[in-house]
Regions:
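Eukaryote-biased, non-catalytic alpha-solenoid scaffold regions
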Residues: 1-587
Length: 587
């Protein structure tokens, strides 16, 4: 199986699958397949393909193209390192990489890259030929400039290599270390290799094993010491890396029982291993054991909050599968209060809906939230807290958080603006707009964008940073049910039918919108001009929905006239008219 980012299977997996397919084919079938493949080869690849086969009168297969081993290879590696140390590649370290406003772009390879690529390819030939001692010696020598630096002690970067499959190369090197180290020293040597290599964070024993057809030898004897070594190692900068390797080793060594032992052993790995333990039991169909494991992990001393919340998530799912909805609600509430996230709020709502206790549960959680921030002396809830308050019908508290917040910085995940403002417009009009209903509908639909789940801040609906490509709404995946916008629409339906309150919400929304537009335009945040224009049109659309057509057009005219010297903003403002349910009057 190909690893993430890899173009195909590892060598061992590939050769095993290839041999399996060969065995079922006759000579004629094999010749036909090779002939068909040869017919489709590009011109530049034909001679290399032909050279694979022994020509008439030849005694043996030729040496693989470009292979130069032994003293010659080590001499070329030494010469390469000397050039690096002497600074012959100085000035080309960045390889032409530059920031183009959207990401890092490269114009050409660094000068050292072709030389390094050739050397790594030749070492790969040595590895494939089975001389792991020579391959290890060569790898260790060539990797020195990448690990300890060259000119001015700046290390070369493996990620700049283009034709070399770096993850496979690293796995091959570790395989060499494993097989050429005496058994009593193997754990320390392999662990040192994992910790030193730049790519060790994405490496696993399974990937090391897959570099050859034969599995890693003596793995059963290696694993107990490997687990102890991982537990006592101090070089892992990330708990996730440690947990990943421990989970793999435990699964290989003793399955769920080994995972349970690790989860009960104090250390920073406990929570992550505990979650893996629960998942392994669930995948194996041992649901009652998985439930017991989740209950144990939730209250296990020393486990961090995020992992206890994950255990509560899994417990709620298992309880729901058993039909115990009341206990499932309790588990969802435990997960939410332990480590609040948008996903947990939605999961809580979904479980409560199924149990028929949504309104009272939201009210209880909102009470707890308001008590917590009042007793702590904080100024008010963040975006996630406001989402809970809106679902519970606590508009006054959410509005206070919105009006107290800065008119800028909406790209921060804690800012209440991207959720509370569209909700206020929807509440003022009495109904949630459809996604295609002008700017108002789009801003409301954007509520479902969870900042914690977006890879780039530029994709956030409230982004007011440097100019960037606008989010492509058509490429967004459909959010899972229940959606926050759907739940908020239900909450709007539960609000009191008070015309005075609706008018007040509209006035507040207009004031917040105007303040944000002013902050963006006067601050010359050009990347957010289009979003500022969208706010103006959204407010006008809300006015129109409430039967205030004249006020809607007057509002648009006033906003445009307010910034006579900001031609870039006025251009975005005029362009926004094409996406609105309204049209600005001629000025």
């Amino acid at each position: 199986m190909a690893r993430p980012g890899q173009a195909g299977p590892a060598l061992g997996e590939f050769l095993t699958a290839l041999h399996d397919r060969w065995r079922s084919m006759s000579r004629d079938e094999l010749v036909a397949v090779l002939g068909t493949h040869a017919e489709r080869l590009p011109v530049r690849e034909r001679q290399a393909f032909l050279d694979i086969f022994v020509g008439p009168g030849a005694d043996a297969a030729p040496t693989a193209p470009g292979r130069r081993v032994g003293v010659d290879l080590m001499a070329r590696i030494a010469a390469f390192k000397a050039r690096v140390a002497a600074g012959e590649y100085a000035g080309d370290d960045d390889g032409g990489y530059h920031w183009d406003g959207y990401g890092w772009a490269d114009e050409e390879s660094a000068a050292w890259v072709p030389d390094a690529e050739s050397l790594f390819a030749d070492i790969g030939d040595v590895f494939v030929a089975g001389d792991l001692v020579a391959a290890r010696t060569a790898y260790e020598s060539l990797l020195e400039p990448f690990l300890r630096g060259g000119d001015d002690d700046w290390p070369l970067e493996l990620w700049q290599l283009e034709s070399t499959d770096v993850p496979e190369m690293v796995a091959r090197y570790v395989r060499c270390v494993y097989e050429t180290t005496p058994a009593d020293q193997r754990v320390d040597a392999v662990l040192r290799a994992f910790l030193e290599l730049p790519e060790e964070r994405a490496l696993s024993l399974a990937e090391v094993s897959a570099t050859r057809v034969d599995a890693l030898p003596d793995l059963d004897a290696f694993l107990p010491g490997w687990i102890v070594g991982l537990l006592t190692a101090s070089g892992f900068p990330s708990v996730r890396d440690e947990v990943r390797l421990l989970a793999e080793a435990a699964a290989m060594h003793g399955g769920a029982d080994a995972l349970a032992d690790l989860a009960r052993r104090p250390g920073r790995h406990q929570g992550g291993i505990g979650v893996v333990w629960i998942d392994a039991l669930t995948a194996g169909g041992c649901l009652s054991d998985a439930r017991a494991a989740a209950e144990e992990l939730i209250d296990l001393p020393g486990v961090e909050a995020v992992q206890r919340a994950k255990a509560a998530d899994r417990l709620a799912h298992l309880l729901g599968h058993e039909g115990d909805t009341s206990a499932a609600v309790t588990a969802r509430r435990r997960a939410w209060t332990t480590h609040p996230t948008r996903a947990r709020l939605l999961a809580l709502a979904a479980t409560c809906q199924g149990a028929g206790v949504l309104v009272q549960t939201l009210a209880a959680e909102a009470d707890a939230l308001e008590l917590a921030w009042t007793s702590s002396g904080r100024t008010g809830p963040d975006r996630l807290g406001c989402e809970l308050l809106l679902l519970a019908g606590r508009l006054d508290a959410a509005i206070a958080a919105l009006t107290d917040a800065s008119p800028l910085g909406w790209h921060h995940a804690v800012h209440p603006g991207p959720v509370v403002l569209p909700f206020l417009w929807a509440a003022a009009t009495g109904t949630a707009p459809l996604a295609g209903d002008g700017h108002l509908g789009q801003l409301y639909a954007d509520i479902d964008l969870d900042p914690a789940a977006l890879p780039r801040p530029e994709d956030w609906s409230g982004w007011d940073g440097t100019p960037s490509r606008p989010p492509d709404h058509s490429q967004r995946p459909e959010p899972a049910e229940p959606t926050l916008t759907g739940l908020l629409a239900d909450a709007i339906g539960r609000l009191r039918d008070d015309a005075g309150a609706r008018e007040e919400w509209l006035v507040i929304a207009g004031a917040v919108s105007d303040a944000r537009i002013a902050a963006i335009v006067t601050g010359k945040h050009r990347g957010a001009y289009a979003r500022a224009a969208a706010l103006a049109y959204a407010h006008a659309e809300a006015l129109a929905k409430m039967g205030k057509q004249r006020q809607a057009h007057d509002h648009l005219a006033a906003v445009r006239a307010r910034y006579p010297r900001h031609s870039a903003f006025r251009g975005e403002f005029d362009a926004a008219a094409t996406s609105s349910t309204l049209r600005a009057r001629a000025t």
